[in-house]
């Protein structure tokens, strides 16, 4: 209970400062208020306290506010009465509302700060509650009231409690019921008060704004009760609705109770009074300057009705709420009638100002209920969410009228959910989608083709062109095709230069061609760019293809298979070419060299050196079979490019070839032997 400790600290501070400030305020407000009371009617007095309260509100000084309050209202007589017997009077009222006593006990530890400020501020029945909030007003109100209220006997009653016992009982009773009703409400809304209690005692302890509404209440009492000046002043806090008649006072202890709990509730429950008191707070637009007076009436509604639901249902339902209240609704109704007669009309306007009033009073809204009540009913409906559903079915009959597609129906539903009050008209949605579909159909349809012209309009077909003059040289076409391919590959001036010289190279002998290869090999590979190498290959290919000799064709394929960039490969190629020439001379081999198959030398075979027309045998070496010369020997070529005879006994067919030739028999057996 941090709030209780803070409250106690403030009590000690205020008690220490009581005599000084009390003396100052006693001296200053007495002459002013006495003069005002003598010269002007209480209505004017009510205006002066309002002005002074406003100035004090701006200053946010709690002590001067209480002093003026004490000066203006009826507090001193009541404190006198309560000093003698504050608790015994409470049991008097306890007979009427038994509930008040029960909540009071638990509430004092929990809401001690709340109850005491309400008593000190509104009723000032006890001096100890006043020092808690501001000990200043206790002392000044006594002399001031002694001076101010010379007319009413009630002012004298505090000094002489036996003179009007009935009135004393009535007055203390309203003061005490103020607590019980405030406590009745804690029973009703115990949790909310417990939550809001620390907040309310804090403003009461700081005595910043909770005391401000006290002034408006006192002012209200003066303005309302101008005829029974002193009596109405004393009783006004108990029930400002009283017309100053003591008969009403006899019946109004209960309504006074309601008024006091209203004040107590202002500190305890700013949220509920505002939430449920939305209808009643507008009735008190006169207290725009004093925010607690509007919540005080709504608070009175809450303790009386014991349920904020009737207030939520309708703002203007003031009388039905007053009816269920057994205690004070009779008194609260006259209060409403007298105080806000002028303001009952601007109720709708006041609704907008209610949130500002709690801000002035610094009464926090701890519940969302006041927010719903402050809003007009039109806005309440969408918030509750119950009225969205009837609006949706209204819009639904329009939706099925839309073209029957799931996507189309979904679009209006989504948009209607965002703004149910303005359902989308089908006219806005329908035309867009069908247009889209029509466009899609048009796009899907193939474009119209123009009809072909008739054969008669075209006439006879043109005649074929004449053949070129002279004999046709087919090789020239081949050369042209080769040059075109070379141009496409190279695309450079050097390539075209070599192509222009191609016919001369073709006419040259094969030896000259080999010399060309030698010249190419002599150049350093590093000096040749990639483009230059490609050009050289293209020129070589162009020169070889036109030749009809099979040997040249075979030789031409080798450089294609092996990249010419590697100098080692080039050397091997040249050696192979020389070996082939020697082979042709030695074996007198004519025709094209064709590789029939490849065979491997048996790894178990005996090795031997080659000599004469025989190749050397090396285990596991693969040889290319060029000719099946006899049953014993075959003409082969080794990987080095040498040619010679190899005995059949040393050769083994490759596994791949064996599987490929299984169905056709051994190719060696099928090969006819030469004679």
Curated annotation (Swiss-Prot):
Residue ranges of domain SH3 in the record: 578-656
Q: Which UniProt keyword terms apply here?
A: Lipid-binding, Phosphoprotein, SH3 domain
This chain belongs to which protein, by name? Answer: PML-RARA-regulated adapter molecule 1
Q: What does the entry report about post-translational modification of this chain?
A: May be phosphorylated on tyrosines.
Listed PROSITE patterns:
SH3 (PS50002)
Entry note about domains: The SH3 domain binds to PtdIns(4)P.
- Spans annotated as Disordered: 1-473, 523-562
Name of encoding gene: Pram1
User: Bias category Basic and acidic residues: which stretches?
Assistant: 23-35, 141-150
Q: Which organism is it from?
A: Mus musculus (Mouse)
Q: Which Gene3D superfamilies match?
A: SH3 Domains
Q: What changes when the gene is disrupted?
A: Mice are healthy and do not display any obvious abnormality. They have normal hematopoietic differentiation.
Q: From what superkingdom does this record's organism come?
A: Eukaryota
In terms of InterPro entries, this protein maps to: FYB1/2-like (IPR043443), hSH3 (IPR029294), SH3-like_dom_sf (IPR036028), SH3_domain (IPR001452)
User: GO CC: one term?
Assistant: protein-containing complex
Q: Which residues carry this modification: Phosphoserine?
A: 374
Q: In which tissues is it expressed?
A: Expressed in bone marrow and mature neutrophils. Weakly expressed in macrophages and mast cells.
Biased-composition ranges, Polar residues, are 1-19, 43-58, 224-242, 251-264, 322-331, 407-422, 537-546
Write down the PANTHER family for this protein, in alphabetical order: PML-RARA-REGULATED ADAPTER MOLECULE 1 (PTHR16830:SF11), SH2 CONTAINING ADAPTOR PRAM-1 RELATED (PTHR16830)
Highest lineage ranks of the organism?
Answer: Eukaryota, Metazoa, Chordata, Craniata, Vertebrata
A Gene Ontology molecular function term of the record: protein kinase binding
Biological process, per Gene Ontology: integrin-mediated signaling pathway; regulation of neutrophil degranulation
